[in-house]
Swiss-Prot record:
Protein's gene: VGLL4
Residues recorded with modification Phosphoserine: S52, S149, S274
InterPro entries linked to this entry: TDU_repeat, VGLL4
Keyword ATP-binding: no
Protein name: Transcription cofactor vestigial-like protein 4
Pfam families attached to this UniProt entry: VGLL4
Subcellular location as annotated: Nucleus
Comp. bias (Low complexity): 272-290
Length: 290
């Protein structure tokens, strides 16, 4: 059975190993090894063996499960920390004299017990003793130097062409609204209001306004518009229907001419031309196309 002196000596050795582990982490020396803690503690113990082996085995079973879980955690953390610990601050890989004097068991137990003691804040040389370890993606992105981030020059931020929304400077404006090509109530030019108006030779407009109307109305927006389209009748109605209906229109026209000539011939003979008789003759006539 262990005496209080053995317990105190083991605790003092763990504290001393923890301090040396912090110094080694600050120097950037990789000392993390995944040696089982149970075998290291059993071989390094200076006290007498337990009196009751069965009782000792029963009491260590829950602890062994916890140590196995901790060993898995240590192995995962060691894979994360090794790339950072392999880079020393000054490129000096020489060992400390105190590190050379320690036994291999102490070198294995010290980093393992320091991780079990929740001292995970001194793994990186650039971090302080009390700063938490940042393993998130945002912190890694924030730790990048500012020179690597893409920066835009003032020339790239500006647009390649002037915007039609922004106003030009007061010195560049040589005209007022009455001289601009858009129609409004303040126009002094006579004639109907239109968007396309012949420009005045004595006035010049804002280049921003010119660019706006050139994009909206085309390159030749200053040219006068042609006269509004008026309805022009070319040809006669007969020509129009002859082109549209063809032979059908000729048949209709012949039927109309025959119908109009029949009342005139009847009146010349002295026979009355009643409308009912005319309608009956039309209804029985096979040549009439309604």
């Amino acid at each position: 059975m262990e005496t209080p002196l053995d317990v105190l000596s083991r605790a003092a050795s763990l504290v001393h190993a923890d301090d040396e582990k912090r110094e080694a982490a600050l120097r950037g020396e990789p000392r993390i090894q995944t040696l089982p803690v149970a075998s290291a503690l059993s071989s390094h113990r200076t006290g007498p063996p337990p009196i009751s082996p069965s009782k000792r085995k029963f009491s260590m079973e829950p602890g062994d499960e916890d140590l196995d879980c901790d060993n898995d955690h240590v192995s995962k953390m060691s894979r994360i920390f090794n790339p950072h610990l392999n880079k020393t601050a000054n490129g000096d890989c020489r060992r400390d004299p105190r590190e050379r004097s320690r036994s291999p068991i102490e070198r294995a137990v010290a980093p393992t017990m320091s991780l079990h003691g929740s001292h995970l804040y001194t793994s990186l040389p650039s971090l302080g003793l009390e700063q938490p370890l940042a393993l998130t993606k945002n912190s890694l992105d924030a730790s990048r130097p500012a020179g690597l981030s893409p920066t835009l020059t003032p020339g790239e931020r500006q647009q390649n062409r002037p915007s039609v929304i922004t106003c030009a400077s007061a010195g560049a404006r040589n005209c007022n609204l009455s001289h601009c090509p858009i129609a409004h109530s303040g126009c002094a030019a006579p004639g109907p209001a239109s968007y396309r108006r012949p420009p005045s030779a004595a006035t010049t407009c804002d280049p921003v306004v010119e660019e706006h109307f050139r994009r909206s109305l085309g390159k030749n927006y200053k040219e006068p518009e042609p006269a509004p389209n008026s309805v022009s009748i070319t040809g006669s109605v007969d020509d129009h229907f002859a082109k549209a209906l063809g032979d059908t229109w000729l048949q209709i026209k012949a039927a109309k001419d025959g119908a109009s000539s029949s009342p005139e011939s009847a009146s010349r003979r002295g026979q009355p031309a009643s409308p009912s008789a005319h309608m009956v003759s039309h209804s029985h006539s096979p040549s009439v196309v309604s």
